[in-house]
């Protein structure tokens, strides 16, 4: 369950395979160049602030009915902020990794999920996957009340939360207030409901479901 970054064996791929025929629109935030969703037959919106990742992803074989490649990150506000290439993160991971990448930092673009939804007239998002190396809560907050139009959310948790100074319960409480429940770890054997939200900083993926969602992903 913890500290397995291989999506094929840590439960991520199995979870997606379980829901893919029940969903139509995906937001892949922090897609890099190796998104699993290029093989999804529906609509996918890809987001990554690193232009190299987006350009490489565009070259991959893609069966999406509609693919939207966005060379910016998502966050709480529209701005430029420093990105640390060694960590592929908007946080310099000096707390969890003890080594600074400040000498290599670059300014990259961030926009809000709310503005993207409004500007592109998006009515519903079935699956929001967030892999942003510590920027998860920033991404989530950027949707504001439009997050209620999302059915399923998956986000990473781990050592990056030492760097962003966020507690897991902060994310849980925010999403609960927005109508999400059934917070669960993805594991190689399926999902496991979380009963203890104390911080352990072990790498894992967490999923939750909007209470208004009629499909049962797990």
Where are these regions (language model features)?
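Phosphate/nucleotide-binding beta-alpha loop and adjacent structural elements of enzyme active sites
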Residues: 1-218
